[in-house]
Swiss-Prot record:
<dbReference type="GO" id="GO:0004563">
    <property type="term" value="F:beta-N-acetylhexosaminidase activity"/>
</dbReference>
<dbReference type="InterPro" id="IPR001764">
    <property type="entry name" value="Glyco_hydro_3_N"/>
</dbReference>
<keyword id="KW-0326">Glycosidase</keyword>
<dbReference type="InterPro" id="IPR017853">
    <property type="entry name" value="Glycoside_hydrolase_SF"/>
</dbReference>
<feature type="active site">
    <location>
        <position position="305"/>
    </location>
</feature>
<dbReference type="InterPro" id="IPR050226">
    <property type="entry name" value="NagZ_Beta-hexosaminidase"/>
</dbReference>
<protein>
    <recommendedName>
        <fullName>Beta-hexosaminidase A</fullName>
        <ecNumber>3.2.1.52</ecNumber>
    </recommendedName>
</protein>
<keyword id="KW-0378">Hydrolase</keyword>
<feature type="signal peptide">
    <location>
        <begin position="1"/>
        <end position="11"/>
    </location>
</feature>
<dbReference type="InterPro" id="IPR036962">
    <property type="entry name" value="Glyco_hydro_3_N_sf"/>
</dbReference>
<comment type="function">
    <text>Most active towards p-nitrophenyl-N-acetyl-beta-D-glucosaminide(PNP-beta-GlcNAc) and diacetylchitobiose.</text>
</comment>
<comment type="similarity">
    <text>Belongs to the glycosyl hydrolase 3 family.</text>
</comment>
<dbReference type="GO" id="GO:0009254">
    <property type="term" value="P:peptidoglycan turnover"/>
</dbReference>
<dbReference type="GO" id="GO:0005975">
    <property type="term" value="P:carbohydrate metabolic process"/>
</dbReference>
<dbReference type="Pfam" id="PF00933">
    <property type="entry name" value="Glyco_hydro_3"/>
</dbReference>
<dbReference type="InterPro" id="IPR019800">
    <property type="entry name" value="Glyco_hydro_3_AS"/>
</dbReference>
<keyword id="KW-0732">Signal</keyword>
Length: 598
């Protein structure tokens, strides 16, 4: 292990007051901060890139146990290191002097908070799953090792990864390509490899989302999902990765799911509106203590998914949510209350006072508080002792070996689902018309094809974001070959941040909802014109069942990340890999990790 037993181990053994214990059980976000601003907290969009004195003082005064960083907090290497060092300095000023858990969602692929030009983000879990039949857990290990080393160099000591949800529901709006596979055994093996690699690189891992978020059609950011599996199916599918990884190599943390599982716990809780409802897993003693700790034997630290998500916040106020969570036996409440300005600091003070009152009146269990604190303190003795170094970070983030690995994974994942003699692109197919979800993806694939083609290609592109059907039809008529791509389902809140982004996503989703019908109509037109057509699934491959029958060939990439670098060039490892396969420079070696009707 690369963790260094820190000098904080002694501090961890010093008895803490109940107030300090409560603070240690909180992980706050400071995504935005507007200081003295009088605007409503929810309207604040000033990125917090340096730690203001009042937030430093709050961390010290309340012995806050952790902080989670978002894309707004991590803008460049020097700034990130300055921020993580400042956060740890604030923790050092607390009475306990326990270090902070500094966490981030850097799963890779669609969920990656650090600028893709700086850090290596890779093409995500489902692309790793596509390599499993030929490569086993090689890419899972190498990718987690690279991400772990990059985070460690920045002073980030917890990665909320890997996702070990088994994506058995094609309509899952929030997991889909964040899952390795629909096969629980494959998910287990790849998740285990990542846990070992993250922690060997000096970063605590957090398996998520317990007891499983793979068979839902509701995103817990926007609603409360319910899974009605019987206990046998839960054991064989949802719980299997957690159970096996806990036995083989227990992760530092496990994250909860805001999901109702009646077969695991059908007891009721009265929410803040006075209504009775089945307990979400996050608030279930039966699930989080009896099942996870007593049956599965997990002795590490548990952390909630963000408590500001609608799956919790629509039903419980911050104090009630925290009390129910702690009484379920969960160790850390993640993002229980937003702090966006000085007025919110006052609100946080009231929140802490109410938690203290809950202890005094036995609404909170003192014995559970002490047990939880012992687990947190024990885990914190594993945190690295030294401060982050800019020189080490500069030589680690996005270094050539990590970029090569990123490109290798993208190529190894490309899956040929169908090919009726269309691929590789024939020499007589010189005029190619692309149909892409937006202009950036047009540019990315155009650039990749032009870069790697030995022949002079004439390329044009229809962006489905805004197009004239007559112009698109003319371009299709003139083309020797049609290459169409789509990404489904649309982005979820977790991919670009969290609950602060839900409104933006709803507006974006309205525009995206018309794209499948538009693409289908254009492919049907191309078919009527007798054109050779290639369809590329850029995300979850289930959409192949819709567009595959209209195409002569089908590829899946599981990723559509587009990077715009400082030279304003548009690129992305998935597009480079696709171009190489389309042009016959490389073979498609991947396999579908999920069942697709085609």
């Amino acid at each position: 292990m690369s963790f260094i037993t820190s000098a904080h181990a002694t501090a961890a053994q010093v008895p803490l007051t109940t107030s300090q214990m409560l603070g240690q059980k909180l992980m706050l976000d400071f995504r935005y901060y507007c200081g003295e601003s009088k605007k409503p907290s929810g309207d604040c969009r000033a990125a917090m890139t340096t730690l203001p004195p009042e937030l430093s003082e709050l961390i010290s005064r309340y012995d806050i146990g952790g902080a989670i960083l978002f894309a707004e907090n991590v803008q460049n290497t020097a700034q990130i290191i300055s921020l993580t060092n400042a956060l740890q300095s604030a923790a050092q000023q607390s009475k306990s002097q326990l270090p902070l858990f500094i966490a981030i969602d850097q799963e890779g692929g669609r969920v990656a908070r650090i600028n893709r030009e700086q850090a290596t983000s890779f093409t995500g879990n489902m692309s790793i799953g596509a390599t499993y039949p030929k490569q086993g857990d090689i890419y899972a290990t190498k990718v987690a090792s690279a991400i772990g080393k990059e985070l460690n160099s920045l002073g980030i000591n917890v990665n909320f990864a890997p996702t070990v949800d088994v994506n058995s529901n094609p309509n899952n709006p929030v997991i889909n390509v964040r899952s390795f596979s629909e096969n629980p055994t494959v998910v287990t093996k790849l998740g285990l490899a990542q846990v070992k690699a993250f922690e060997a690189a000096g970063v605590l891992s957090a398996l998520k989302h317990f007891p499983g978020h793979g068979d839902t059609h509701v995103d817990s950011h926007t609603g409360l999902p319910r899974v009605d599996h019987d206990r046998d199916k839960i054991n064989q599918q949802d719980l299997l990765p957690f159970a096996e990884i806990i036995k083989a190599s227990p992760p530092g943390m496990i994250m909860t799911a805001h999901i109702q599982y009646p077969a695991l716990d059908n007891s009721k809780v009265v929410n803040s509106q006075g209504e009775s409802m089945i307990r979400p897993a996050t608030m279930s003693y039966q699930i989080m203590t009896q099942l996870l700790r007593h049956e599965l034997g997990y002795q590490g630290v548990t952390v909630t998914d963000a408590l500001d998500m609608a799956g919790i916040s629509d039903f419980f106020n911050p104090v009630d949510a925290t009390i129910e969570t702690f009484n379920a036996g969960v160790d850390i409440a993640l993002m229980p209350i937003a702090i966006r300005n000085r007025a919110d600091i006052k609100r946080f003070e009231q929140y802490m006072a109410q938690l203290a009152d809950a202890l005094e009146t036995n609404k909170l269990n003192q014995e559970q508080l002490s047990s939880s604190m012992a687990r947190i303190a024990k885990l914190k003795t594993k945190l690295p002792q030294s401060s982050a170094s800019l020189a080490i970070a500069n030589s680690t983030l996005g270094n050539p070996s990590h970029r090569r690995l990123e490109a290798e994974l993208a190529l190894a994942a490309i899956t040929e689902v169908k090919n009726d003699g269309v691929l590789p692109l024939r020499d007589n197919a010189q005029v190619v018309h692309l149909i892409m979800p937006d202009r950036q993806k047009c540019f990315a694939l155009e650039q990749a094809l032009q870069t790697y083609s030995k022949n002079s290609l004439t390329l044009s592109c229809t962006s489905l974001q805004a197009y004239d059907p007559d112009i698109a039809h003319d371009a299709i008529k003139q083309a020797d070959m049609i290459i169409a791509a789509h990404a489904s389902p649309p982005q979820s809140a977790v991919e670009i941040g969290g609950m602060d982004d839900v409104k933006k996503l709803r507006e974006h989703g309205v525009a995206r909802n018309v794209q499948p019908a538009a693409l289908k109509a254009l492919l049907q037109y191309g078919q009527q014109q007798g054109k050779k057509q290639l369809f590329i699934s850029l995300r979850a491959p289930y959409e192949i069942s819709t567009f595959g029958p209209l195409s002569n060939a089908v590829l899946a990439s599981y990723a559509y990340n587009v990077d715009v670098n400082h030279d304003k060039k548009v690129a992305g490892p998935a597009y480079t890999a696709l171009a190489k396969v389309i042009l016959g420079i490389a073979k498609a070696e991947g396999s579908l990790p999920v069942t697709v009707n085609h």
